[in-house]
């Protein structure tokens, strides 16, 4: 139960996420965020908090060889194997957005796709995608999802990655 939205601008990539944490049918008040900046990457995830924690731990010492779909897929495959070795099962449960070296990627299971405009994932993705389509920022898009979906809630966390080459 989450929403993560991101948008590629001329000079930066902006990613925002809600902060809901659910256990069973109960919402937990917590400071657990679904988005983090680690090792020169910004990653936002939806799904299992356990898998997200494992991803963040893995990212401390690993990153893709380059900002290409192929190398991000290799990174995800290696994470999946590592996760299995750690006892978390090797199948990926979560969807992720990854900003790396001025590029934005959507990751769903073993599918990696570079995003050139905007994207949203999670329970509030339809609301957030509509807001992004209408020209709103990722933070505004997540706010719309928080207002309209019972599965996501504030506070909203936002990270930015500058595009030095202004591609």
Please annotate each region the language model reported:
Residues 97-101:
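Short hydrophobic alpha-helical segments used for membrane anchoring or interfacial signaling
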Residues 147-156:
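Short arginine-rich
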Residues 94-96, 156-157:
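Short polybasic amphipathic segments
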Residues 141-147:
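Low-complexity, intrinsically disordered Gly/Pro/Thr-rich segments
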Residues 105-113:
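Positively charged, Gly/Ser-enriched RNA/tRNA-binding surfaces
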Residues 1-92, 112-139, 153, 161-166:
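Conserved short S/T/G-enriched processing/targeting/catalytic segments and their helical context
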């Amino acid at each position: 139960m989450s929403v993560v939205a991101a948008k590629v601008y001329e000079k930066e990539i902006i990613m925002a996420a809600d902060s809901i944490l659910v256990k069973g049918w109960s919402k937990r008040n917590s400071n657990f965020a679904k988005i983090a900046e680690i090792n020169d990457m910004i990653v936002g995830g939806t799904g299992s908090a356990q898998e997200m924690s494992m991803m963040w731990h893995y990212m401390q010492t690993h990153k893709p060889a380059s900002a290409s779909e192929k190398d991000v897929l290799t990174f995800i495959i290696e994470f999946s194997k590592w996760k299995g070795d750690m006892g978390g099962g090797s199948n990926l449960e979560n969807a992720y957005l990854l900003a790396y070296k001025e590029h934005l990627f959507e990751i769903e299971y073993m599918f990696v796709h570079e995003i050139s405009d905007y994207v949203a994932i999670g329970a509030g993705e339809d609301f957030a995608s509509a807001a992004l389509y209408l020209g709103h920022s990722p933070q505004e898009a997540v706010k719309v999802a928080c207002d309209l979906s019972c599965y996501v809630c504030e506070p909203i966390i936002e990270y930015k990655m500058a595009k030095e080459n202004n591609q």
